[in-house]
Amino acid sequence: MVKLSIVLTPQFLSHDQGQLTKELQQHVKSVTCPCEYLRKVINTLADHHHRGTDFGGSPWLHVIIAFPTSYKVVITLWIVYLWVSLLKTIFWSRNGHDGSTDVQQRAWRSNRRRQEGLRSICMHTKKRVSSFRGNKIVLKDVITLRRHVETKVRAKIRKRKVTTKINHHDKINGKRKTARKQKMFQRAQELRRRAEDYHKCKIPPSARKALCNWVRMAAAEHRHSSGLPYWPYLTAETLKNRMGHQPPPPTQQHSITDNSLSLKTPPECLLTPLPPSADDNLKTPPECVLTPLPPSADDNLKTPPECVLTPLPPSADDNLKTPPECLLTPLPPSADDKLKTPPECLLTPLPPSALPSAPPSADDNLKTRAECLLHPLPPSADDNLKTPSERQLTPLPPSAPPSADDNIKTPAERLRGPLPPSADDNLKTPSERQLTPLPPSAPPSADDNIKTPAERLRGPLPPSADDNLKTPSERQLTPLPPSAPPSADDNIKTPAERLRGPLPPSADDNLKTPSERQLTPLPPSAPPSADDNIKTPAERLRGPLPPSADDNLKTPSERQLTPLPPSAPPSADDNIKTPAERLRGPLPPSADDNLKTPSERQLTPLPPSAPPSADDNIKTPAFHPQRMIISRHLPSVSSLPFHPQLHPQQMIISRYLLSVCGFRFHHQPMIISRHLPSVSSLPFHPQLHPQQMIISRHLPSVCGGRFHPQRMIISRHLPSVSSLPFHPQLHPQQMIISRHLPSVCGGRFHPQRMIISRHLPSVSSLPFHPQLHPQQMIISRHLPSVCGGRFHPQRMIISRHLPSVSSLPFHPQLHPQQMIISRHLPSVCGGRFHPQRMIISRHLPSVSSLPFHPQLHPQQMIISRHLPSVCGERLRGPLPPSADDNLKTPSERQLTPLPPSAPPSADDNIKTPAERLRGPLPPSADDNLKTPSERQLTPLPPSAPPSADDNIKTPAERLRGPLPPSADDNLKTPSERQLTPLPPSAPPSADDNIKTPAERLRGPLPPSADDNLKTPPLATQEAEAEKPRKPKRQRAAEMEPPPEPKRRRVGDVEPSRKPKRRRAADVEPSSPEPKRRRVGDVEPSRKPKRRRAADVEPSSPEPKRRRVGDVEPSRKPKRRRAADVEPSLPEPKRRRLS
């Protein structure tokens, strides 16, 4: 037993706080005590000592502490501290003061007379008590308070013991406090609050009143000694008079002081336990939270915390609320157990529910131990038809003598394939059962050849006789249960891993059979004939197969190129059997083609019936790079890539197809039906000879099995389509074509991928082989936005209603190109490229561009609006116009050469080869208000000589930046007009620009007179940034006609003052016309800043430029078209070929 003697004398307590703390700590260090509460109590005692108290006249006070455990020291020191505080309070009222001269005593002497007779409010009882200290405190109150403090200290010790135990347990097991432990602490707090209330009720009101005043005085003394603002003996009523409001109720941490004092109390003052009050609510200080209450009859769920760690005995109302550590052992079966058993109990075997002498039942299999279940369990008798698919592989319980079905009981690890179907399977069985072979039920027959190894099967299997009409495509490979002697259907029993291709169609397939039936041979029913070639191995087939005899009148369009059976001497149609690699052009038309033949007949060379004429270019066969025929009424047209090292190909696209797509192929023609709602192309072997793509008309869905080079999944109404990989060493392709697919996605494949859809909300592009020259095309009609990643050579994004179109990079070593075709795009831009040029109509609903070999010669694609098909071989210029062209001819007519009917003029330059055209052609007079956006980058000419027309002749590659804007640009002018130079206001006139040779035009032509007033936001921002002030803008109608006319447009020039504009080549060297200078070369003094129309004052001698609607009709004659020009004029009428 260790004894510690601490002597507390008045001289010892009169020391300052720092010295007292050091001396007490020296005594504490001399004692080997493991408890940390000893130092904490000593420090608290040093902080709350009272100087000047003689402790009842006693010279010193010896405190003998004997502790067998460390907690006895804490209890004894707390009692000593309480006695010291109470003795000081009691004797303070008797002694008054000791004559000291410090601030505290002087404040006491000054306030005693003012506080005499006043009554304050107790913070606990909320009653008015006397402010005199030391009265009505008897020995009974002290003893009651001592018992309460002891209970409070024991609660602290109990809390520490429980916390130490739990923390030690968590430290060993490496776990944190669980929700159950937290609930245990909350219950302990509730027990502690009940104990507090129990002891507070035993304290008489007289002791409570005195203690309230004592606490208030001790707090004020502590603030004075610590240097904080000090109000001596501040009572609740004095605080109310000073602050002007009622003091709030005490908080949980500071329930002993008022609001203003609690905010300034340092944290070391909160370590002193306060005596409880009888009317304290549940917000007792937290140091007594873990005090357990004595057990009562209604404490069933409020078990002490140390008893919660052991599992409670099961009760009737304990369903699933058992603690988690008690769930490690299986619970006994309950009568009200439902199917919602916790997941941790699902792996525990149930105890036997029947006696050992009871006969085994079918349900005993469910009670087998989990480690013995090496194969799936048999199904239960009450399973309905909606059992999950894993039940199909579960063997049935033995209920009959051994039969053919006993193979199902084979262990799962020995089953090499799926199990056979059951007799009671309905028609809606999942697809995995369809590939299950049937048990042997007949001797081998001649049809067992289907079991031949797959490497020896050179062609598809014959069709089956009992295929129904609406069977899904995966059921074609599903064997039927044996119901007859061996027949041709036994081939279906071949294991699925030996089937190298899809099974042939059935003989009773209706007209909606999938397209794979077209290439499937019929079963032998006659002596060898011409149809036996179908059984020839695929690598030996040099041409397409002939049609079948039972094809109805609605056969797809591939019959047009299909040779008929030999019924007549050789004719011109036999050329169809020629290998595709030897066909340099399209085949001639057939005799039975009706008037609605697809557009491929338009490129078919006709027999010679007339001498060569200008129209013979349309009949020219395929040319070196490519030929494209694009119909007039196609809502969406897709472009097709091809082999880069081979010769050209011909793509024939029908007129009324809703969706047309093609894919990369070796060297082949493509025939596409006319009325197909969905068109798909079929893949084939890439290393073989020609091929033919047959596209069905009435098939709702077309699918094929996996084969060597490619796979194609085409569907019309599929909600989702996924692509499958194929041979990586070949040059295959995968095409996913759908009409109503909400989303289309596919995996990466070797060369390229095309995703074409009409109503797809989103289209994503995929990468492909980087060493080839493939292409990715995303064509859509109603896509709100189209984006794609970078790929090897090119990318084309074609859309009709896209709000924005962005160009993508492509092969860096080649001469790239960028083709962006759109009808209603607010801005259209295209880069200069080496191989080809595209002239795109303005009114086409959908236009598609085609890439070609980058090392070949250039190409020009002319897409007409009213021509059903236009093509040419190695055409250096566009085709001549037709006789039936209306006034709304597309813009490509501007480059159409006129037949030689007059001496050489400026229009002859339109026949210049496309590769020499440096810029777009000038706009026509009949252009509507929606001028293309390529005029946005065209600079305006300066407002002073050198004239603005010279800038147009400057080479485009020397222009470092756009030209400055014009001063008379209105706010609603189209964006392409902002940088467009205006024509000069004197001869040579601005209309001559149209006649300028195309190869000498370095920039876009000036705007037309009928441009609308909708200026883009870019011009408004630039103009607003430049102008120093913004006066009120006046319209042209409100201004008086100025004496000096404005700069007139092309349409404003009178015919008499409009001489023919000379070309750049016609200008003599001595011409005073200076060379066009760049923006940076113009001197600031000669190039004043052009003002906006809004900045021009009404009194300015040079008014602003008026709009088109403000020009008087008499001064703006209507611009005549080419057809309205009389023959007597110097400018000849553009004549047509007819």
From Swiss-Prot:
Keyword Transmembrane set for record: yes
Residue pairs linked by disulfide bridges in the UniProt entry: none
Subcellular location: Membrane
InterPro entries found in the cross-reference section: NPB13-like_MII_rpt (IPR048893), NPIP (IPR009443), NPIP_N (IPR054697)
Lineage of the organism: Eukaryota, Metazoa, Chordata, Craniata, Vertebrata
Keyword Disulfide bond found: no
Superkingdom as given in the UniProt entry: Eukaryota
Record region (Disordered): 241-263, 291-620, 873-1138
Bias (Basic and acidic residues): 406-416, 448-458, 490-500, 532-542, 574-584, 908-918, 950-960, 992-1002
The species this protein was found in: Homo sapiens (Human)
Biased composition (Pro residues): 349-359
Official protein name in the record: Nuclear pore complex-interacting protein family member B4
UniProt GO cellular component terms: membrane
Pfam name, any one: NPIP
Biased composition (Polar residues): 252-262
Bilayer topology annotation: Single-pass membrane protein
Record-annotated membrane-spanning stretches: 63-87
Keywords: Membrane, Transmembrane, Transmembrane helix
Family: Belongs to the NPIP family.
